[in-house]
């Protein structure tokens, strides 16, 4: 199942806001070296948009088998996308604050151009009936939007779209 989303705005506000007022509120100018912080795009959006119970003991972690199966499906989908498809594109953005330097980083599953428009593809393999999805899972969309923002910023692009590719791990559809 592929869901294409063209940008409603020219930028993603999540990271833009981080570059602006949130990161510079401290207002202190210490001569000490800035603290270096690193976070993956996935961990950032999962933390920001976390829902549900604050007790995470009952949430089950993804099994090693499911992770291996997800990796296999990713590679299969990426391999079927054609020569113009760039797979596993590393992206990072450094956000400077007064007291620290935050590096937001990750890998876009794929980047491609279609009809003159650039898209970031976020692939998700899962044990759900993906054919019933009418819209992307919000946190998955947020992850793709962050990758798209970083890629667009680094390539001086005013617009960029995202594509969510969902695949059932059992049926491979």
Regions found by a protein language model. Name each.
Residues 3-118, 138, 142:
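Metal-dependent nuclease catalytic cores that hydrolyze phosphodiester bonds in DNA/RNA
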């Amino acid at each position: 199942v592929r869901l294409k989303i063209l940008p409603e705005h020219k930028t993603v506000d999540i990271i833009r806001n981080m570059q602006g007022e949130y990161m510079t509120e401290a207002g202190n100018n210490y001569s000490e070296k800035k603290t270096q912080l690193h976070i993956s795009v996935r961990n950032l959006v999962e933390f920001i948009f976390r829902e549900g119970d604050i007790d995470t003991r009952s949430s089950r972690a993804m099994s090693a088998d499911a992770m291996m199966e997800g990796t296999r499906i990713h590679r299969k989908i990426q391999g079927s996308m054609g020569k113009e498809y760039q797979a596993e594109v590393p992206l990072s953005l450094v956000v400077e604050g007064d007291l620290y330097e935050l590096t937001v980083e990750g890998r876009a599953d794929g980047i491609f151009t279609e009809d003159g428009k650039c898209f970031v593809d976020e692939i998700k393999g899962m044990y759900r009936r993906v054919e019933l999805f009418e819209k992307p899972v919000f946190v998955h969309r947020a992850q793709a939007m962050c990758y798209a923002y970083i890629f667009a910023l680094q390539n001086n692009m005013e617009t960029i779209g995202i594509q969510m590719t969902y695949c059932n791990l059992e049926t491979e559809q």
